[in-house]
Amino acid sequence: MVDKRRPPSPRARYIGSQIYRGRPDARIVSSPRHAPNRYIDRPRAETMSFELHLQPPGPEARAVALKELRETEENVKQGILELKKYLEEDKTIYYKTDDDFLLIFLRPCKFYAKSAYDLMKRVAEFKEKNSSLFDNLMPADEKSAILENNVVNVLNGTDHKGRRVLLVNCGKTWDPSRVSADQILRLFYLVHEIAMLEPETQIFGTVVIMDFEALAMKQVLGFTRAFSMKLLTFIQDAMPLRLKEIHIVKQPFLFTMVWQMFKPFVREKLKKRMFFHGSKMASLHTHIPPSHLPKNYGGDLPEIDYTSADWYPTLIKNENKIKEWNSYGFRKEQ
């Protein structure tokens, strides 16, 4: 929230389309409803249609960026200059170098240019190693998986901390004979390509809710060791988004078999961000309040399905951005 008693800093200026200030005009303000989290309450998701929020970060986001990401005018300018230099010197990889695009990689790396450059190389390596899954991947390639198979959805709005929420149904509605685990990974990839375009999502990050209700052996067998390694490599090494939390809900005893497959590849940093709630929605609500969850998870919002009809048009609308992303990575030999 901006302190209106003070005039705007004369040092305020734009870098790309983002505004930065010489002093932190924004600060996090306690909310009576979410005082423990110290974040301003946000509109309930049901009041928002699914659309990308591409405007520059607001006061709350700028305050979080300053506190958590070292996002000062000086660090932004220096990070962009250094990252451009790394990319100019490396002739093996290709990414565009406009300021706003580079922020996608600098923000999760707290504006350390070398770390952002290393992330760009890992993204290129992941795409090359899994080219059969991701080369020229477009939304239409997975239209049926998205619209007809009730596996992946994205909440229309954000949660109370401004984070995008991805919902994955790995239980009763997932038929591995119709949508493979690798296809689920392709859906994740398409969603992340769009989510990372939002400046505030770059700052606030994302949350994943994985629903294992009525998990059966056909779903357990749908997960493979190879898939678990690919998924965790993507999440931990090659995703330029801040993954803040993963919530496992409604998991039966059979889930132990799935977890044993993934557990060896989960690093300590990710383990600390994973929460296992079972059927106790009150446990989930300590992280995301009912006001920002659908009825499926003890929330106040209407019950949802997983057809993804709300956000598929957003993918189609931004196909040009997805095509651009497909062109990035290691340069192809002529």
Q: Positions of the model-derived regions?
A:
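Basic, amphipathic alpha-helical/coil surface patches used to engage anionic, phosphate-bearing ligands
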Residues: 2-334
